[in-house]
Amino acid sequence: FQKLIAVPLEMTGSHFTPVNTDGGHAPMLGGGLCTTLNDYIRFLKMIYHNGRFGNKEILKPETVQTMQADQVRNAVVAPGEYVEKALGQHHTGIYGLGEWRELVDETTGEAYQISSPGWAGAYPWINKREGVCGFFIAHVQGGSSKEDGFSSFYGSPVLSRTVSEIVGTNNK
């Protein structure tokens, strides 16, 4: 990670933490990234620009395209699951590689909004159609789902869509 991603992206405040600190443990990939908002935005911008950061190619465009392609064709997705509940769009092409394909063009099947939400309240997203990327962090006291129905896991995608609609390139 440091050599291939963090250093070329100038992510000076980012590293993965081990599962525990006793030694001999590999970094924890799911939820183990310690970073700053500025560093993470650099990563999102690189993905948005198909693997490029400034004049550097960090990932090949084909790699980003593969990450965002439907990896589990015709996945069984029950009505009312994450994408439909959060964004109102039911489709079975929700799984990319390390990314959720949240909003998909019905004609081409290409994802135009991707994300990688975490149950702990982190929600990075890219909306290619509107030219917007961002990162929400929500902290909810107690459990992740409240008696009034609020859930940071389902709430952040709604906020991302609202931000995309307000500041996106199609609205200027």
Q: Regions from the language model: what does each represent?
A:
Residues 2-7, 12-172:
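Catalytic loop of the DD-peptidase/beta-lactamase superfamily, centered on the K-T-G motif
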